[in-house]
């Protein structure tokens, strides 16, 4: 969960080549094109490298990704890094990723950092982030309304700022853990990655209602992270919030397809249906003219009229990356191609180097900041878009954008690094052992 409100990513080229060679040989190979498997990377084993397609040498692309990781994870702590080591405990080293601007730690950033680490074969960083998450954020008490999930926000010393849950974090934790099991195998306890993923995934849809002290005080009742009937991620699992609603950027059909194969067997059909429900929601919430989607939505696809939810703002620009990666991995829903085309046409019309990052759905600009994270996500839409010339413009815009630093480097930087991984074909599927 990210908002600008109170509640609200360079080693020697030789080493980089070794890493990327491993990436090209150890991910899950193509399962074969079929109606069930789709026609994307899961079926074919082929991940497009949009930078190479645009004419950049593979070695330069590889070096760029590694340099970005090094800056954000191990750069100058004053104005470059978002990853910070934090001692150790009985489970090993601890580390967190912090939102520099808001002086806090969020499950969003921790889970993003873990999936980046899994993709880039950085086991030490992965384990340290997972250890910190469990040490400080995990709701362990069985009478806690948040039991089995993670408090979404804390200070850098681990003191919780909120007990509430933001389901985007749990979803990325699960996917990162499955990929870790595929890359490195499973260890013991906290580092039995697949067992941890299975348990959390099961709770996301099956955990019962628990009433107790939670959130901002008082007695609250929280349940599972998904609306089980609509098969959609909730903005928050507090069931006494009426009506319940969703955040389109929490919808990750590319992940749900994998969970329908790798997760607990009794839930395979559920996750397959959830993938389709998310694709259908995208088609409802996205403007057919601008390609923009609201920050928050009701389950029927209408914008949620609260918390600024009717506008393209805050979390909203992550959504296009979700549907574009879904097309890249699965290739099941051609509507995603049209949505990417509409979005690219809109932002191109606003000027490739100066479009803003907040709009009404009909295209009136609300905020003029040219966000580096949005540049990255818009480049990802080239994975699904159909106009080669225009798609290349968006890829080149990301290539020409420097690694975020300074005050905004948390959200912009993590989205930027994930954008580099997606556009270089190195954000891949790693089947768990």
Segments from the language model and where they lie:
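Bacterial N-terminal signal peptides
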Residues: 12-20
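Alpha-helical support elements that line or immediately flank enzyme active sites
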Residues: 111-123, 133
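Extended ligand-binding clefts on enzyme/binding-domain cores
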Residues: 33-74, 78-81, 103-107, 142-148, ...
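Aromatic-rich carbohydrate-recognition surfaces in CAZymes
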Residues: 103-110, 158-185
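Bacterial Sec-dependent N-terminal signal peptides
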Residues: 19-37
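Bacterial N-terminal signal peptides that target proteins for export
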Residues: 2-11
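Solenoid-like repeat scaffolds
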Residues: 397-407
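Solenoid-repeat scaffolds in large eukaryotic assemblies
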Residues: 113, 125-126, 190, 197, ...
């Amino acid at each position: 969960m990210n908002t600008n409100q109170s509640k609200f990513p360079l080693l020697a080229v030789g080493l980089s080549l070794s890493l990327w060679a491993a990436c090209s040989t150890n991910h899950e190979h193509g399962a074969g094109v079929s109606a069930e498997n789709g026609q994307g990377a899961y079926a074919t084993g082929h991940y497009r490298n949009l930078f190479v397609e645009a004419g950049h040498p593979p070695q330069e692309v590889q070096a760029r990704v590694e340099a970005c990781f090094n800056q954000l994870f191990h750069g100058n702590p004053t104005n470059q890094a978002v990853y910070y080591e934090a001692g150790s405990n009985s489970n090993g080293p601890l580390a967190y990723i912090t939102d520099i601007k808001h002086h806090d730690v969020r499950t969003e950033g921790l889970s993003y950092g873990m999936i980046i680490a899994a993709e880039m074969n950085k086991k030490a960083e992965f384990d340290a982030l997972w250890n910190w998450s469990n040490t400080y954020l995990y709701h362990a008490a069985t009478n806690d309304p948040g039991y089995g999930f993670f408090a979404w926000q804390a200070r850098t010393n681990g003191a919780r700022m909120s007990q509430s849950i933001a389901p985007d974090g749990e979803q990325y934790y699960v996917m990162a853990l499955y990929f870790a099991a595929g890359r490195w195998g499973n260890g013991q306890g906290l580092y039995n990655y697949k067992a941890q993923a299975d348990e959390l995934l099961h709770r996301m849809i099956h955990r019962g209602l628990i009433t107790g002290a939670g959130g901002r005080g008082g007695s609250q009742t929280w349940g599972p992270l998904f609306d089980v009937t609509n098969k959609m991620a909730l903005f928050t699992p507090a069931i006494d919030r009426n009506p319940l609603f969703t955040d389109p950027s929490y919808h990750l059909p590319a992940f749900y397809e994998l969970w329908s194969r790798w997760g607990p067997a009794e839930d395979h059909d559920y996750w397959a249906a959830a993938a389709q429900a998310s694709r259908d929601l995208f088609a409802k919430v996205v403007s057919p003219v601008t390609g923009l989607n609201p920050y928050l939505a009701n389950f029927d696809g209408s914008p949620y009229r609260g918390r600024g939810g009717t506008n393209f703002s805050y979390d909203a620009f992550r959504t296009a990356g979700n549907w574009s990666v879904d097309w890249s991995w699965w290739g099941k829903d051609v509507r995603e191609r049209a949505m990417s085309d509409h979005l690219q046409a809109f932002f191109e019309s606003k000027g490739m180097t100066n479009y803003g990052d907040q709009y009404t759905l009909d295209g009136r600009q609300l905020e003029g900041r040219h966000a580096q994270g949005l540049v990255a996500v818009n480049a990802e839409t080239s994975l699904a878009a159909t106009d080669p010339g225009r798609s290349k413009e968006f890829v080149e815009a990301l290539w020409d954008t420097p690694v975020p630093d300074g005050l905004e480097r948390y959200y912009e930087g993590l989205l930027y690094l994930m954008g580099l991984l997606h556009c270089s074909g190195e954000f891949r599927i790693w089947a768990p052992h």
